[in-house]
Every structure is written in structure tokens, then in C-alpha cells.
């Protein structure tokens, strides 16, 4: 996927390089697991917690997506989070008019690309979520009744 930021086009790809970016994997995993576990959560706390994390989540996700083409193995224009932060800031300024210049939409765009690139499978998130959904209820292992009878001597 290509993102136009400033006067340059950046290629976003979620492949092995992104999966090796701890910040990206941590942010997307926390975000996706949080969204998957909304049941039984205080809605107000969930919304506030999610909203306060959107900027840093978007930054970590963007940084990971830039690694393949613009990191050490690419053109070397994005070598740290500070570089990605400048691009994120510029993207928000550039895209206010088209409606995608906000953290929520940026995350949506990036998650969509992650899905297309198979990123969730690469990092094991798909399998982890599937395992959580197919868990069978635990059965008690102690099926014997306790002998409460007092033995006489």
C-alpha cells in the first residue's frame, strides 16, 4: 500500500520486518486483544483507555509498516520512531480535508493493510485468538468424593 505524506509516497508493508518490530507487534496485539475482549468491560473505561492509546498505537503500527521499504533494509529514510512520528504528524496535517487525518482512521487503514499482508498470521495473533475462542470449559479433575467418615480405632 502507498501513503502520500508530504511530497513523497511511502510504501507500507506488514511482513517479516514489521513482525520483528517489537513496538508494532505490542501495539497491534494490545489493540486487537482489547477489541476482542469488550464483553463485560465497563464501556466508559474501555473507550477512555482506547482513545488515550490511539496516538501511540498508530505510531507503533506505522513504524512497523515502514520498515520493509524505508528501514535498514530499504531506503533507510525511517530508522527510528522519531522518523515515523514526523511522518505521522505530517500525514495528519496533509489529510485533514479527506477525513483520514486522525488516529482512528489511520489505525483502520493500517489494520486493513495488515490483514491484506497476512501480518496477523505472521505474528501468531490469528491463532492465539482462535485458540481463545475454542477453549472448552474446564472440568473438575477430582471426581472422587471425600471420605468424611471418621475411622474408629
What residue spans do the PLM features occupy?
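Short, hydrophobic/amphipathic alpha-helical patches that form generic packing surfaces
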Residues: 56-68, 105-113
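A contiguous binding-surface segment within folded domains or other stable secondary-structure elements
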Residues: 19-57, 61-63
Amino acid at each position: 500500500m502507498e501513503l502520500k505524506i508530504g511530497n513523497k509516497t511511502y510504501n507500507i508493508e506488514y511482513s517479516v520486518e514489521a513482525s520483528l518490530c517489537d513496538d508494532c507487534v505490542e501495539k497491534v496485539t494490545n489493540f486487537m486483544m482489547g477489541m476482542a475482549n469488550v464483553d463485560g468491560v465497563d464501556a466508559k473505561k474501555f473507550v477512555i483507555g482506547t482513545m488515550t492509546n490511539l496516538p501511540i498505537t498508530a505510531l507503533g503500527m506505522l513504524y512497523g509498516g515502514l520498515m520493509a521499504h524505508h528501514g535498514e533494509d530499504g531506503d533507510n529514510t525511517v530508522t527510528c520512531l522519531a522518523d515515523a512520528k514526523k511522518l505521522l504528524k505530517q500525514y495528519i496535517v496533509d489529510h485533514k480535508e479527506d477525513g483520514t487525518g486522525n488516529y482512528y482512521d489511520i489505525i483502520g487503514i493500517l489494520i486493513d493493510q495488515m490483514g491484506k499482508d497476512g501480518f496477523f498470521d505472521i505474528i501468531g495473533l490469528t491463532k492465539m485468538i482462535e485458540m481463545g475462542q475454542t477453549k472448552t470449559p474446564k472440568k473438575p479433575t477430582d471426581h472422587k468424593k471425600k471420605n468424611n467418615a471418621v475411622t474408629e480405632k
